Amino acid sequence: MAQVFLGMSGGVDSSAAAVLLQAQGYAVSGLHLSLLSGLPLPADRLPDDGSDARAVASLLGLPFYDMDLSPEFRATVIDYFIREYEAGHTPNPCVFCNRRIKFGAMWDAARKLGADYLATGHYAKIRQDPATGRHLLCRGADRSKDQSYFLCRLTQEQLSRTLFPLGDLEKPAVRALAEAHGLINAQKRDSQDICFVPDGDYVSFITRCVGHESPTGPFVDREGRVLGQHKGFIRYTKGQHKGLDLAIEPPLYVLRKDPADHAVYLGHNEDLFTSELIAGDWNWISIPALTAPMTVTVKTRYSQREAEAVAEPLSGGQVRLRFREPQRAVTPGQFVVLYDGDAVVGDGVILE
């Protein structure tokens, strides 16, 4: 019987995944990750999901392990998060965490305990292309919950030993399954925030981590005129309008940031639209590499509606995307994910 270690967050999704895996005949063990030990978080802001995960595992008769990967999380995800903001970028820590921690360090731990597969409660699918043998990452059946964007950095090796039991289900069916099996978290609210910034105040979090306030600097318009002083370099992201505290009409928006002098450049809404981007650090999934222009659909952030584009290979492993229609606030540091139908072609980090 194949041994599956299931990442259990304490939420309804991973708990329902345990029920499905048991029904499919796997020997299932629960594995809960503690990631936030030692971080400068107020005690009342620390999530306590481990108790729910343990209770569900007990109800279902699963062996259960609670593993503290806080040092690894701090050294990879948190350091990346801070470094990217200080460089003037807007990071996506969940994408980074999935590859390095949840499907990296957690798998390493599970393998030492005898795991054949790692499973999670993500809404996505994995299938193997019969023609190429490559493992494909595909969108989940519930398009409103699809998490393929956040899983875009997974490698072929990681995909080959991963199971997503919820891929064919929609959220109401998942809750109904949990209710039918008497799971205590069947109606538990979905988490919406970055786990280490539960109140959404990433500026205060970074300030506590680094021990000082973010540098101030000038607001500058497109003509190079200084419009005033901002309150801290990391407080602003491309496309932002609220919080500028500038009484100027028509309204101004953040266009870009320069870490050299901590300047924040402002312009009008129409200045935010672009017809192309360049991205690097690519992770290819459905293909080994991009060698010729390819028509794809694109997401430059999770909440974005997909846009049609042509992907063109450049030198040095970079790719240019030319959009059919201009896109707003394409932000350096974010991940751009390419789709061919429901399958993820690959992803890169937006450079410009």
Identify the residue ranges that each predicted region occupies.
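ATP-dependent adenylation/nucleotidyltransferase module used to activate substrates
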Residues: 1-152, 163, 172-173, 179
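AMP-forming adenylation/ATP pyrophosphatase catalytic core
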Residues: 119-126, 130-352
